[in-house]
């Protein structure tokens, strides 16, 4: 696993955006051979999305031949609800770039058969040969997507009950009212994410420091689902300084030393 540590959230957002753009550009996608990109929601990737929008406006990256799969969606709220993940993605990213609507895939939390919706999502990912780069964030308890503590590390796309901690954390998007937050969601599984060719996780803030410690310095543990990345052959965590405060000094120095040449990844 690689750990890229940069001073601020703005720095890691720029780094993540540049990394995504570089991967797409290196692949040189076409209509017949598209790039398959996994995407997250939440506060962590917003800065990355802003940077990718600018790169797209400046014609340094195109999304015309990129197919996206989002990580998750709430169950029981309409797609046009202001806090649905459909709305989040269109408001914060898709409506600002040159992606084709038919290339966007987001789970339908109002499907008549939710189990079938999850199964079909997995099949569609496999039909494209799998996800090439899956970008994600984590919660303070180390969850990826809605794979809460205790989730199977081989889990697939499924229905998931949200923990009270996640409901409280997400209430900030629902006028601070926990009663307005959906209690269930559809989410890709840890196994789904681990099948990707590459995983990039954005970690920022003091409240993520304990989760980062479990990801980097502790063993693989289903109570900290982020720790599964230790088993991935091509995983990167990009973290701001605030999120590293529970890591050992030697750990931080080690990763800073071996990744120093990769701190600046600006597009040429």
From Swiss-Prot:
Activity control mechanisms: Allosterically activated by N-acetylglucosamine 6-phosphate (GlcNAc6P).
Cellular component, GO annotation: cytosol
Positions marked as site (Part of the allosteric site): 151, 158, 160-161, 254
Matching Pfam families: Glucosamine_iso
Record-annotated membrane-spanning stretches: none
Gene Ontology biological process: carbohydrate metabolic process; glucosamine catabolic process; N-acetylglucosamine catabolic process; N-acetylneuraminate catabolic process
Pathway, per record: Amino-sugar metabolism; N-acetylneuraminate degradation; D-fructose 6-phosphate from N-acetylneuraminate: step 5/5
Keyword Hydrolase set for record: yes
Active site per UniProt: 72 (proton acceptor), 141 (for ring-opening step), 143 (proton acceptor), 148 (for ring-opening step)
Domain of life the protein comes from: Bacteria
Catalytic activity: alpha-D-glucosamine 6-phosphate + H2O = beta-D-fructose 6-phosphate + NH4(+)
Enzyme category, top tier: hydrolase
GO MF annotation terms: glucosamine-6-phosphate deaminase activity; identical protein binding
Enzyme Commission no: 3.5.99.6
Keywords: Allosteric enzyme, Carbohydrate metabolism, Hydrolase
Record InterPro entries: Glc/Gal-6P_isomerase, Glucosamine6P_isomerase, Glucosamine6P_isomerase_CS, NagB/RpiA_transferase-like
HAMAP family: GlcN6P_deamin
Function: Catalyzes the reversible isomerization-deamination of glucosamine 6-phosphate (GlcN6P) to form fructose 6-phosphate (Fru6P) and ammonium ion.
Family, per entry: Belongs to the glucosamine/galactosamine-6-phosphate isomerase family. NagB subfamily.
Protein name: Glucosamine-6-phosphate deaminase
Provenance organism: Borreliella burgdorferi (strain ATCC 35210 / DSM 4680 / CIP 102532 / B31)
